[in-house]
Amino acid sequence: MNKFRRVRVVGHDVRVAVRPGTEAGPPLVLCNGIGASLDLLEPFVEQVDPRIEVMRFDVPGVGGSPGPKVPYNFALLACFVGRLLDELGYDRFDALGISWGGGLAQQLAFQHPRRCRRLVLASTATGSLMVPANPLVLAKMVTPRRYRDADYASSIAAQLYGGRMRQRPDQVRHVLYEQERLGSRAGYLLQLLAGVGWTSLPALPLIRQPTLVLAGSDDPIVPLVNARIMRALLPNVSLHVFDDGHLGLLTAADELGPLVSEFLTAQTGGTPR
């Protein structure tokens, strides 16, 4: 059962959902994609081992969190999330980031090396220095229209998300709309700006945490080659390629939820979770 609450962090109200775990251990902190509220991740959360506590939040300006007072970048946002975790009483944590949230998760691992225990990167890349998507795909991501217009989202689902959406583009209505809360257009723009000029490429060799990279075999937004680049640069990494597209963490949650759970609960060097 998820517990929803609002947490005050450096003058901002942040909407948070916590699914308590049945055992003690670091929580899994979920960092969502651009423009997406925490509700979108529910299909994945349902597939995560119940022993693991799962925390997710709406970035300021997205979903149920009011807009930020000033623009931010990933470094500032990682500091902000660190303060949020302090307010929630979390010392150590595991981080999972999907798409845009993968950039935030990498920044968290880099800035909080003693607190971030393990890292999961799903359908994401290294920021501005990456193998980019087709320009026609990128053009469809400039605005949050796909979150506001179900017919439009269905019409572009195959080209934008790939994977299972190529055969069943109408499924995007279920994935994006059933539980989605809209943020402001300004909030979406600020998320775009946060990534301008940011790259994790030179920092990847310094991220020592055990890392699991999840990549779809048919992801138009983040081509698979980016995951292979990350595998080459991260010092303690495993790569899992799944047969789906950019939204695979949601549409293939029955496969990826248990896989992530196994990675997080595995013992390393005799130290239990």
Where do the language-model regions lie?
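Conserved HGGG/HGGXW glycine-rich cap/lid loop of the alpha/beta-hydrolase fold
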Residues: 12-64
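Gly/Ala-rich beta-loop-alpha elbow adjacent to hydrolase catalytic centers
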Residues: 97, 101, 105
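Short beta-strand/loop motif that positions the catalytic acidic residue
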Residues: 207, 213-215, 219
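Catalytic histidine-centered segment of alpha/beta-hydrolase-like enzymes
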Residues: 244-257
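Conserved alpha/beta-hydrolase catalytic His-Asp/Glu region
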Residues: 150-203
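Flexible "cap/lid" loop of the alpha/beta hydrolase fold
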Residues: 106, 110, 117-146
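Conserved alpha/beta-hydrolase "acid-adjacent" motif
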Residues: 220-226
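Active-site loop/oxyanion-hole signature of alpha/beta-hydrolase fold enzymes
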Residues: 56-96
